Amino acid sequence: FDPADLDYFVLNHMEPDHTGAIKTLLRVAPKATILCTAKAVPFLKEYYGVTERIKEVEDGETLKIGKKTLQFFHTPFVHWPETMMTYDVEDKVLFSCDAFGGYGALRGYSFDDECTDLDYYKRESLRYYSNIVAKFSRPVLNAIAKLGGIDVKVIAPSHGLLWRDHPEDIIALYTKWAEYATGETETGVTLLYGS
């Protein structure tokens, strides 16, 4: 395809690992408009000097693109304040940004049903959660509650495996981990020793 034919760039999140190529993309796609939350607009200006060709999308707003409908869900502080998720209504794919993500080299496959060591990726998802998302456990639970009414067949995070065979598994894991950080805790002591 010719990038000049692109109409939109969806920015679910403004961290540079998600947006570092935006100026180049705008140059090669001169008709394209950026779709993002209102909170992302100042980031675009400060990080990249981009102040034009931006459309702020509202929480729950839909956009018909050909035979596809995109729906945008604001999920603030599921890592950063401007974060949103995008839902492909027809294919039931949730582009979840940093939520439901994981670490781990993909070893030649992208989907949960293709991999031979799913437990490894679940552990890598826990490592990712604890390092990237855990501080934002309450917003994670809020996002899960907000999205509870949509029919998700595939979860496509920005990092890690795409979950198409059992998307409910990664949702359940993230729910459990978020509840660890926000619910009742066990009293305990950790002893660290090094020599």
Positions of predicted regions on the chain:
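Glycine-rich phosphate/diphosphate-binding loops that line cofactor/substrate pockets in enzymes
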Residues: 1-4, 146-151, 180-186
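Terminal amphipathic helices with adjacent charged low-complexity linkers/tails
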Residues: 154-186
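Active-site neighborhood of phospho(di)ester-bond hydrolases with catalytic His/Asp-centered motifs
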Residues: 6-14, 35-37, 94-97, 155-159
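Active-site metal-binding motif and surrounding structural segment of the metallo-beta-lactamase
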Residues: 1-34
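Metallo-beta-lactamase
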Residues: 31, 35-157, 162-165
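Redox- and metal-dependent alpha/beta enzyme cores, enriched for Fe-S-associated oxidoreductases
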Residues: 193-195
